[in-house]
Amino acid sequence: MSGKCDVVVVGGGISGMAAAKLLHDFGLNVVVLEARDRVGGRTYTIRNQKVKYLDLGGSYVGPTQNCILRLAKELGLETYKVNEVERLIHHVKGKSYPFRGPFPPVWNPIAYLDHNNLWRTMDDMGREIPSDAPWKAPLAEEWDHMTMKELLDKICWTESAKQLATLFVNLCVTAETHEVSALWFLWYVKQCGGTTRIISTTNGGQERKFVGGSGQVSERIMDLLGDQVKLERPVTHIDQTGENVLVETLNHEVYEAKYVISAIPPTLGMKIHFNPPLPMMRNQLITRVPLGSVIKCIVYYKEPFWRKKDYCGTMIIEGEEAPIAYTLDDTKPDGNYAAIMGFILAHKARKLARLTKDERMKKLCELYAKVLGSQEALQPVHYEEKNWCEEQYSGGCYTTYFPPGIMTQYGRVLRQPVGRIYFAGTETATHWSGYMEGAVEAGERAAREILHAMGKIPEDEIWQSEPESVDVPAQPITTTFLERHLPSVPGLLRLIGLTAIFSATALGVLAHKRGLLVRV
């Protein structure tokens, strides 16, 4: 027996570490078992002379993400704003169009109506989905049986709206529109605060980063917990048949605990042997929920040359031939270590993984030169990347997605305890699931479930609302009267049709009254 404790936490990502910290603060004896040789999970900060520090995994925080902001502040971390001072670029059909604001402007009036209706409809549908129980939405079954591709084919009349919406899905959940359930995706966007909040840098999910990197959140909790965090300990068995739970690792250490928190992506539960076996619904759930595909790429330059052209570094790039769909400036706040971060998303991650690292860098630089209209993009000084698809202890990134039909059938067991095993991980969150924020919410909620089971807190304290961050306040997302009331393209056509019928009828009546109609 390697050790007795109150709680074993499986997984040393942000969710597991947040759970362990809360339990530790309550005076409980906690052991964290982490499969890798580092903590952080899907956050991963590297340090070297070329980059100083760099987040190769989850990195961004913003207003309304109050749990992660509070925890990070408690750990002594500070944030800085991602650069969005200059103009953004929308690159479509080989041309670059500078703009400001969260969404690229649309000049064609019919296309404008279509784009406006697209974002409005997604937000309206999201409002019907309960954040904590998407399967309870009035039209849950209908929406869950539909892919996002099918929904976009229904909503969008113009190719430009459909293309941008497809990029939006790829970017938000690193999956293709035909792979994900419409119900799940609409829930995902809703619980992040809607289409504008999730996509925005300023006043949105990508507003800030941590000085020194997001990996420090888990690292600093590890410093607090000391040797209670065990690295290179993949869990292979969890046995609940005795008085206490026995947790065995790959190197045959056995830990005995009163309770267990599983803080790993749901599908990685398949790497663990359970005794007694998992209940039917949990057993099937974990075989049905994959993670997205993404390669995070960072190209370094001598200086942030794009700023000289009044570009902030954000590029939204459409087209199958473009390896990267979305970029952000990744220069350090003092202006040093100039860099552009870009995502290779979904099927492109699978396709471009066949190339060498140098070949990928070359493709990125050529793309940036074209989009930014600058040969300086062809002279990188350094390049880093991380292919999350090859991580056996993540399974992909950013998060788990739900294919059609899964949320309504299996969603309700996501957070359901199995005996003395409780479930954390960003996937189980109800606000900013898929983000570091969701990881903290879920970890702390699972910890409080155990505290309640131990009689240390009342049931009504398991779920807690988080006060707004003083340092990173949220501005409300507003829409104009026109945006709320403009017709969709079909609505406009119906209006034109009705107007034509009404006009023809009125003319007929007038002609009849004046005796202009000749009877044959």
Swiss-Prot record:
Transmembrane segments: 490-516
Essential cofactor(s): FAD
Subcellular location: Mitochondrion outer membrane
Modified positions (N-acetylserine) in chain numbering: 2
GO molecular function: monoamine oxidase activity; primary methylamine oxidase activity
Residue list for modification N6-acetyllysine: 52
Membrane topology: Single-pass type IV membrane protein
UniProt keywords, alphabetically: Acetylation, FAD, Flavoprotein, Membrane, Mitochondrion, Mitochondrion outer membrane, Oxidoreductase, Transmembrane, Transmembrane helix
EC number: 1.4.3.21, 1.4.3.4
Modified residues (S-8alpha-FAD cysteine): 397
Name this protein carries in UniProt: Amine oxidase [flavin-containing] B
Organism from which the protein derives: Canis lupus familiaris (Dog)
